């Protein structure tokens, strides 16, 4: 009987329940609650469920004491040396294997490949001026970098230059880009930045409208834009090739993201590789999304997530996103003035690369002011330009700080 009781005691002492009673054990319980809350947002509120659901579940798995699903000490530093590869293969958990795709920068470009197969660049080709709106929305990234450096200079929080650059990319409202940049510059902040980036992407319909209305007049919001011209198939095919060459020559570090985005789009527009285009946009993208979200979620352990840095990242991320939206709208106002009122400034807010949510918000706000107005296709131009812009901004940040 005594041996049986000792066995039960031993089982309990080696269980995760016992570890909750250890110093700091309550932090893991808090993180599990945070993961459950994110699951609620994904399932009930449908906030970015494709990403948030596996990410939140990964967060829960990583904070179950003793699960051993990931060992972040393997990934400290800029690269993986040969002995560490062997250590991961022999003793690593499931998330260690999956996280190698993040560490090596494999998943985000493949996500961009899938995005390219679903993206229509015709509105941008039809109205090249909308590229300026997509570029203007990236000012939020660089403005937030300066804000993070200011916080560091005043001693409020000790963000390094690389960490500041990684945080600022949240302003692009592009989850894969944020993960790609952070994994290169500040992998220790990956979980916090990924959660913030995807949360703000889901909150686009909440965050953007007040900013759009505050910066525009009713007259500007009711502007009806001319119908876009038809774009030939030849131009649709030439565009991704031309963009890849030009952008890669100007910003080589952006080549991998822009190149994969344009490869996916070329598959779509060429019309000769339907089978692999559908695979890239459906099966492959779905698989990579699961791997990416789960492995990133597993990096959000209590000791790296529950600190003051996370709070500042969330605040700076909101500032970055708001600045990007405001910059796009202000650029739209300039174009409104220069064209004699032919451009509706509301489409400028779609310059952030949350596709197609930001464009839908422009459409919704515009239609609330003028029910006969249809801005969706006009807003898609800046929206897809924002995807290119965020990839270019990522390349610039990696080039400077990588």
What is the predicted role of each segment?
Residues 244-331:
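Transmembrane helical segments that form the transport core of multi-pass membrane transport proteins
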Residues 100, 104, 112-118, 133-143, ...:
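Alpha-helical membrane segments and immediately flanking helix-loop junctions
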Residues 39-53, 57, 66-69, 154, ...:
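Flexible hinge motifs at transmembrane-helix junctions and intramembrane kinks/re-entrant loops
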Residues 61, 99-125, 264-267, 285-307:
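Hydrophobic transmembrane alpha-helices of secondary-active transporters
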Residues 196-272:
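Membrane-embedded hairpin module used as a gating/binding unit in multi-pass transport
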Residues 43-52, 70-72, 98, 118-133, ...:
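Interfacial helix-loop-helix linkers and transmembrane-helix boundary segments
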Residues 1-23, 29, 75-87, 91, ...:
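Intrinsically disordered, low-complexity non-transmembrane regions of multi-pass membrane transporters
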Residues 123-145, 303-328, 379-383:
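Entry/N-cap segments of selected transmembrane alpha helices
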């Amino acid at each position: 009987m005594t041996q049986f009781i000792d066995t039960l005691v031993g089982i309990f002492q080696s269980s995760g329940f016992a570890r909750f009673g250890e110093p700091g054990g309550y932090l893991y319980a808090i993180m599990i609650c945070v993961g459950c809350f994110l699951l609620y947002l994904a399932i009930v509120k449908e906030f970015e469920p494709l990403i948030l659901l596996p990410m939140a579940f990964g967060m829960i798995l990583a904070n179950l004491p003793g699960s051993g699903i990931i060992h972040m000490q393997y990934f400290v530093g800029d690269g993986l040396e040969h002995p560490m590869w062997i250590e991961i293969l022999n003793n690593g958990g499931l998330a260690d294997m999956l996280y190698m795709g993040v560490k090596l920068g494999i998943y985000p470009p493949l996500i961009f490949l899938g995005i390219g197969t679903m993206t229509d660049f015709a509105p941008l080709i039809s109205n090249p001026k909308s590229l300026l709106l997509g570029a203007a929305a990236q000012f939020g990234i660089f403005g937030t970098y300066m804000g993070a450096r200011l916080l560091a200079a005043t001693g409020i929080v000790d963000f390094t230059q690389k960490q500041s650059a990684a945080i600022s990319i949240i302003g692009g409202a592009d989850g894969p880009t944020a993960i790609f940049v952070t994994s290169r510059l500040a992998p220790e902040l990956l979980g916090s930045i990924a959660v913030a980036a995807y949360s703000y992407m889901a909150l686009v319909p909440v965050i953007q409208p007040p900013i759009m209305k505050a910066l525009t007049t009713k007259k500007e919001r009711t502007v009806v834009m001319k119908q876009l011209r038809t774009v030939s198939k030849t131009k649709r095919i030439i565009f991704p090739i031309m963009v890849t060459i030009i952008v890669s020559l100007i910003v080589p570090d952006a080549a991998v993201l822009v190149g994969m985005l344009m490869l996916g789009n070329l598959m779509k527009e060429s019309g000769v590789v339907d089978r692999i285009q559908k695979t890239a946009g459906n099966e492959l993208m779905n698989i990579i999304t699961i791997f990416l979200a789960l492995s990133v979620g597993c990096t959000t352990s209590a000791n790296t997530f529950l600190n003051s840095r996370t709070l500042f990242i969330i605040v700076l991320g909101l500032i970055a996103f708001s600045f990007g939206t405001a910059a796009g709208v202000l650029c739209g106002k300039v174009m409104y003035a220069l064209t004699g009122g032919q451009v509706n400034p509301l489409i400028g807010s779609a310059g952030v690369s949350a596709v197609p949510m930001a464009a839908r918000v422009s459409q919704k706000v515009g239609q609330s002011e003028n029910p006969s107005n249809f801005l969706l296709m006009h807003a898609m131009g800046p929206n897809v330009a924002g995807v290119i812009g965020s990839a270019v901004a990522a390349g610039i940040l990696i080039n400077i700080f990588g």
